[in-house]
């Protein structure tokens, strides 16, 4: 079943949803609403380590030859990186990646993600992707783990910057009036 594409069923009674194919779904804390048919499913989840299986589908095809768009491959690798850390408020902030070969419709990629710098909020995760024995992807992702949702953190930073700016403007106006 490892190389079987679960999305290419012949009739609806044979369809296996990615959510059903993901036995670790209850252990996953990060990115809970991610569409697994675009990101892959976890089959190994350990501290600082995750392995996922990424199934290529017709929705990912970019030309008549069945070439899979590299953006989907990146998403699958990024999801594996997130799972290696597996914290609720973890977001990607950078990546250095290499594609070593194209994917075609029907290919199944296994991503192996290893996280480093466990004691730090800013983490680095190395992700390698193989189709069978052939390495097709390698990348290093930078992720940050936050104490709250990134939008909450962002809003607090905006408010803090606004307060600093307003204070500076008041001080400048007061200096102008006194000078």
Regions found by a protein language model. Name each.
Residues 2-22, 89, 104-105, 116-179:
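HotDog/MaoC-like acyl-thioester-processing domains
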Residues 48-50, 91-95, 109, 121-123, ...:
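A generic structural signal for short beta-strands and their flanking turns/coil linkers
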Residues 30-68:
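Catalytic strand-loop segment that frames the active site of acyl-thioester-processing enzymes
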Residues 35-39, 94-96, 110-112, 124-126:
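Conserved beta-strand residues within beta-sheet cores
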Residues 52, 95-99, 113, 127, ...:
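A structural signal for short, well-ordered beta-strand segments
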Residues 59-78, 82, 94:
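Compact, glycine-rich, soluble single-domain proteins
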Residues 79-109, 115:
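Hydrophobic beta-strand-centered segment that forms part of the acyl-chain substrate-binding groove
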């Amino acid at each position: 079943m490892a190389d079987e594409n679960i999305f290419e069923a012949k009739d609806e009674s044979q369809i296996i949803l990615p959510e059903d194919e993901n036995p670790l779904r209850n252990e996953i804390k990060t990115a809970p609403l991610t569409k697994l048919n675009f990101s892959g499913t976890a089959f190994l989840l350990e501290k600082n380590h995750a392995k996922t299986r990424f199934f290529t589908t017709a929705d990912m095809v970019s030309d008549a030859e069945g070439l899979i768009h590299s953006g989907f491959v990146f998403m699958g690798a990024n999801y594996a990186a997130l799972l290696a850390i597996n914290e609720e408020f973890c977001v990607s902030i950078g990546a250095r990646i290499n594609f070593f070969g194209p994917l075609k419709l029907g290919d199944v990629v296994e991503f192996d993600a290893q996280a480093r710098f466990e004691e730090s909020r800013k983490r680095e995760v190395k992700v390698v992707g193989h189709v069978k024995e052939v390495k097709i992807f390698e990348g290093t992702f930078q992720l940050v783990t936050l104490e709250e949702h990134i939008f909450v953190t962002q809003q607090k930073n905006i408010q803090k910057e606004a307060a600093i700016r307003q204070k500076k403007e008041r001080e400048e106006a007061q200096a102008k009036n006194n000078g």
